[in-house]
């Protein structure tokens, strides 16, 4: 087997000296199309030879391998250039070397056409145009009036026109024009810079891996937490004082004296207590406010009676123009007299007192309690206080001391009954002493 490793250079007339088309980049060349294996296979078919066989070897370390390929055609081996980094490029280089050597070995009078004269030139030129995103090459053939070669063809690619040699047929003229364009493109400046090599497929320079530049991550500013809106709910607070449990419910109604609702009267809060010693029940009403109290037995019941009717209790009515005056040092209310005296009758047993507030007194936040007493005195000559005197006791119903005040009044009346005269009215205070109005 004959082996050729050092091919002879081409004649000077076949050197690549034509400039590359305008717009062609150095990174994309004709050899990137990899058509030399196809050319070699087409040549073998036309010559009646066997299909070319490629043998590729791998050398060097695993991270930087080096490939070298050998092609066998017509019992002749052709080796590729050394230093390729991939198998495909090494095989293309071996096919190119084989084609170059076959062209030189073919006699001039042979019937087999040269590889450059086949239709692969047009295919190669079209594939190159697609790689470069150019338009499809256009061929314009003209027929001169005189001459042995009647057809001349011009091909345009990348904005540059290339004129081929004259040919007897239109097809041959297009092939020659494509061949002229390929030779011009292959003679670009990059091929000249690599030592003006006659081969197209040459090993490229290895490009080191660029260090990955990670973008500097800027920390995102923390978002301020939004303040949560607290919902106001109606809460029940249980307060214990002196053994009394009071259930207070928050009222979201409009408050009296508000800037927008100045005409709205304040509705007093309903205070409900269990019936026990000294417990006071207060309930508001539009026409009259009724206060019910169920004290122990030692407290007398007083009910209002305008017509002086006989009953178990006496009627207590506050004055229309009464004013509430509360003493700062005590929870005791100041009693104001009424213009008209209300008669009271003696009753043998009085257990509790029923008190009624007045509307005008409610506006000020206090309740006027008028206490008319039916007292059984024995002996009557002991009393030195003038009879028929009205007694009024003003007590703040919102004060926790109101039940205690009534309890004290009842104890005072029960313990000092000898000082009271029948049908007499007196001013009552929490102090055990009694004062005349």
Curated annotation (Swiss-Prot):
It holds the Pfam family Raptor_N. The keyword RNA-binding applies. GO terms for molecular function: double-stranded RNA binding; ribonuclease III activity. Residues 1-22, 288-331 are annotated as: Disordered. The keyword Repeat applies. Residues 288-310, 320-330 have a biased composition (Basic and acidic residues). Residues 35-104, 120-187 form the DRBM domain. InterPro entries: dsRBD_dom, Raptor_N. One of its GO terms (cellular component) is nucleus. Keywords: Repeat, RNA-binding. One of its GO terms (biological process) is regulation of gene expression. Binds double-stranded RNA. This is Double-stranded RNA-binding protein 3.
